[in-house]
């Protein structure tokens, strides 16, 4: 033991730490005993560009020696249901990383994304639409978090043909789910030092359904006096987003509105290819690209292997924080943003012509 101590001491003398090392760190992260144990994460590569971008994440995780092991399952959007073993895997592991799953337009195949959310009660979708240093956009100072109810609303999947040529689609809003998503939005704002929560609605027309959603948000807002609460009609919200997006902070929405607003805000802030996101419930979480806007089915992008991996890499940083691996998360996020800021390695959607692999190699080289 004494010899080993001398050896370590000699190595330190030969390679003294930089006097600036401590300046680059925050106050020490003190893990709890056992926090470094490797975690198993369910991996669903998905359709289209999914295998490309999830493969990018696997490479970067391996390069970082992150304590994460992936349990891979092949799930495709044209399946009639999510295989039971996949559901059991997510229930067991608590966390899933997912590429995009295509949902056929029309026909009798239901969305596997909705099946996963309902089966696992993953009720909140979160998309962080924020300007990324180095990407030139029309608007600056955009930092919007869109929190969307994930399990009901227009996406309940309750549709039927009443008589030939007449289809009825039901929008379901409940007090329980509305209060739950409102509580999550305010809790997120409180824990992340956000100053304002905006509820998005169409209660001027859908007076009962969206009226119940607003009533629930107002009830929850009473318990967070330090956070400003306001409301905006969804069509006005869309106009305000493209005119003055910096006015928004946290937005809480029913299902359909949140999907549209998140993709719009992502486009304003720099593009869907760089916006991270995740879905969370009381027991489970699924991390994926924050806003997809049709990238899943881009066959040309798949053939050329030029899918942008940035959004899923940043979503993976969110996942690492969720797993309580904050240092690995910081390293990954810093490396990705450094590559974007330098501007040398970018895919076509960001003004470059790089392949997915070239971006991945640049991120790995930038890891500290």
UniProtKB/Swiss-Prot annotation:
**What keyword terms does UniProt attach to this protein?**
Magnesium, Manganese, Metal-binding, Mitochondrion, NAD, Oxidoreductase, Transit peptide, Tricarboxylic acid cycle
Tell me, which GO biological process terms does this entry list? isocitrate metabolic process; tricarboxylic acid cycle
In terms of Gene3D superfamilies, this protein maps to: Isopropylmalate Dehydrogenase
> Where is this protein's transit peptide?
1-26
Please tell me one Gene Ontology term that the record gives under cellular component: mitochondrion
Predominant location category = mitochondrion
Q: Pfam families, alphabetically? A: Iso_dh
Tell me the tissue specificity.
Answer: Mainly expressed at a low level in pollen.
PANTHER family, alphabetically? Answer: DECARBOXYLATING DEHYDROGENASES-ISOCITRATE, ISOPROPYLMALATE, TARTRATE, ISOCITRATE DEHYDROGENASE [NAD] REGULATORY SUBUNIT 3, MITOCHONDRIAL
What is this protein for, i.e. what is its function? Answer: Performs an essential role in the oxidative function of the citric acid cycle.
- Quaternary structure and interacting proteins, as annotated: Heterooligomer of catalytic and regulatory subunits. Interacts with 14-3-3-like proteins GRF1 GRF3 and GRF8.
Protein's name in the database? Isocitrate dehydrogenase [NAD] regulatory subunit 3, mitochondrial
Q: What organism does the UniProt record list as the source?
A: Arabidopsis thaliana (Mouse-ear cress)
């Amino acid at each position: 033991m004494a010899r080993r101590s001398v050896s370590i001491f000699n190595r330190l003398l030969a390679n003294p730490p930089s006097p600036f090392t401590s300046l680059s760190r925050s106050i020490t992260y003190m893990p709890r005993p056992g926090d470094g144990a490797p975690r198993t994460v369910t991996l669903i590569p998905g359709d289209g560009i999914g295998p490309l971008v999830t493969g990018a994440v696997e490479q970067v995780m391996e390069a970082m020696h992150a304590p994460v092991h992936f349990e891979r399952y092949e799930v495709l959007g044209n399946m009639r249901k999510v295989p039971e073993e996949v559901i059991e895997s997510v229930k067991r592991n608590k966390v899933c990383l997912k590429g995009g799953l295509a949902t056929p337009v029309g026909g009798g195949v239901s969305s596997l994304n909705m099946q996963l959310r309902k089966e696992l009660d993953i009720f909140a979708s979160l998309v962080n639409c924020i300007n990324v240093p180095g990407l030139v956009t029309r608007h600056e100072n955009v930092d919007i978090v869109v929190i969307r109810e994930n399990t009901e609303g227009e996406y309940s999947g309750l549709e039927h043909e009443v008589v030939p040529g007449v289809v009825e689609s039901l929008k379901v809003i409940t007090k329980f789910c509305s209060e739950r998503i409102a509580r999550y939005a305010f809790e997120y704002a409180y824990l992340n030092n956000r100053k304002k929560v905006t509820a998005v609605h169409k209660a001027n027309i859908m007076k009962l359904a969206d009226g119940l959603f607003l009533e629930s948000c107002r009830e929850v807002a009473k318990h967070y006096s330090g956070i400003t609460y306001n409301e905006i009609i969804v069509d006005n919200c869309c106009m305000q987003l493209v005119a003055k997006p910096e006015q928004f902070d946290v937005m809480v929405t029913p299902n359909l509105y949140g999907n549209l607003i998140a993709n719009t805000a992502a486009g304003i802030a720099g593009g869907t290819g760089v916006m991270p996101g995740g879905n969370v419930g009381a027991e489970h979480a699924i991390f994926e690209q924050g806003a997809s806007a049709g990238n899943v089915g881009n066959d040309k992008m798949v053939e050329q292997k030029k899918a942008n991996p940035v959004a899923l890499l940043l979503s993976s940083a969110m996942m690492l924080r969720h797993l309580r691996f904050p240092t690995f998360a910081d390293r990954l996020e810093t490396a990705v943003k450094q590559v974007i800021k330098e501007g040398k390695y970018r895919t076509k959607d960001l003004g470059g012509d790089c392949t997915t692999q070239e971006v991945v190699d640049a991120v790995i080289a930038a890891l500290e």
